């Protein structure tokens, strides 16, 4: 499992230009079962995506499809972890 931590490199006005394309990208990976949750950071300096992927390479290939990545709107920190304890029902996502 992976956490994608996005930090904006551009002003919000630039982020907004690519926001719909980013939302479409998110929806694609929710439909494929890769994305579990996502949302904005508070304050709005970037976002977080929780992703299920079989390898670091697959997670990177998913990141590289994001319009925010393609247009250098955000930088990404990729954090891999193994959930060892989780809430009831979360096992559906592991």
Would you name each region that the model predicts?
Residues 1-94:
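Conserved, structured core segments of small domains
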């Amino acid at each position: 499992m992976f956490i994608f931590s996005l930090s904006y490199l551009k002003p919000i006005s630039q982020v907004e230009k690519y926001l719909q394309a980013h939302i479409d990208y998110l929806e694609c990976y929710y439909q494929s079962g890769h994305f579990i949750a996502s949302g904005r950071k508070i304050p709005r300096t970037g976002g977080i995506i929780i992703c299920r992927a079989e390898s670091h390479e697959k997670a990177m290939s998913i990141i590289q499809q994001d319009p925010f990545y393609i247009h250098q709107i955000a930088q990404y920190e990729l954090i891999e972890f193994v959930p060892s304890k989780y809430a009831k029902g979360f096992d559906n996502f592991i």
